[in-house]
Amino acid sequence: MGIILSIIFVICILVVYDLCLSKYGLVCTDYTVKNSKIHTEIRIAQLTDLHNSIFGEDNKRLIKKVADQNPDMICITGDLLNMDINNVNIALNLISGLSKSCPVFISLGNHEMNYRYSDLNELIKKFEQAGATVLNFEFQDLKIKGETIRIGGLYGYNLQTANEACHDDEVEFLSNFQN
């Protein structure tokens, strides 16, 4: 009986450790994507599903970790907020801190789309005032290091891969994005 309780205790400790690591740990993963149309290295930092997480006072650990990667642009791809927490200041301070080193672009996720404490247009305005460009069903052509690249924001939670399964506006957006 004592061995079983010890094993259960160790498993509980490991689960708590893993949960803390996933909530408060910062991990950078590098990916190299080659494109025949781009001849210069462009570094993009991509953040997603932060859900109002805080990494150090005023998110300084996260801001430093991103800045240390020396990105040319930062893309936040949804769920910067937690839809049921009435505190947008965590996100605004993060955007403000990140935007000091390079441009920040945001594509909205379901937590922004369904945020309970603010109208969507007001939320977008706050993100933009903090220093981000919000791409909500739109795209933008950018010049970075002499290269023209197109980025866009499309909210399509569980977006289907087959055109016939997508909404007409999503198909139109993706078609225009490719051109």
Enumerate the predicted regions with their spans.
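A generic short-segment signal for beta-strand/edge and adjacent turn/coil regions
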Residues: M1-I3, I11-Y17, R43-A45, I74-I76, ...
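N-terminal membrane-anchoring alpha-helices
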Residues: M1-I38
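A short linear-motif detector with a strong N-terminal bias
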Residues: S6-I13, K23-G25, D84, E112, ...
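Short, flexible loop segments at the rims of nucleotide/cofactor-binding pockets, characterized by
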Residues: L21-K23, L50-F55, L81-I85, Y157-A165
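Mobile, glycine- and charge-enriched loop segments
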Residues: K23-G56, F173-N179
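Short beta-strand-to-loop junctions in surface cap/lid or active-site-entrance loops
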Residues: K34-I38, K65-A67, G152
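Conserved catalytic scaffold of divalent metal-dependent phosphoesterases
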Residues: K37, N52, E112-N179
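Membrane-embedded segments
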Residues: T40-N136, Q140
